[in-house]
Amino acid sequence: MTDRIGSEDTLLLPGRRHLLLAPLLAALPLGLSVRRAEAINPAETQVTLPDQIKWTSWSAGPPHSAEMATLFGGLDQPGEYVVLMKWYPGYMSAPHSYATDRLCLVLSGTWWVNSGTDFDPEATVPVPAGGFVRRVAHTPHYDGVRKSATEPVVIGIFGLAPVDLKLVDPSKPAWRYA
């Protein structure tokens, strides 16, 4: 009787080796099948590589003061927008405000920022690459790159348009050399 129970146990309860091998054998067909990723669908995922970004001179400033690249939407069209702004050393915006919040991420370099209607480049605060700045709607501020800097700053700016830029003092230029 002992022999018979032993043989039934073997049939009902497989050895430990079989328990360990079962999941591996079940997964084997998955590992052997070779699948290639589908080609990217530009209607679903749009990619712009760095060498494809179209930079244009900032119309409100002198040549080589700042450049802008629109990646999505537009500053004067209703809806979301994403732009890149590049400030060169020595140039800053005059105090101004926007009708909507702006969310800004420093991508490279150091951005110098401050709030208020007075323009004092020495009172600006440095925001290095990786830093985040939220510009609250209808609040005056100014920013750019101090002339002592050795490289430009590139900022990714996200928000809702139209931005409706308003200078604190429209009788003065929209930029300053600082």
Language model features with spans:
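Conserved short histidine dyad/triad with adjacent acidic residue
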Residues: Y81-S97
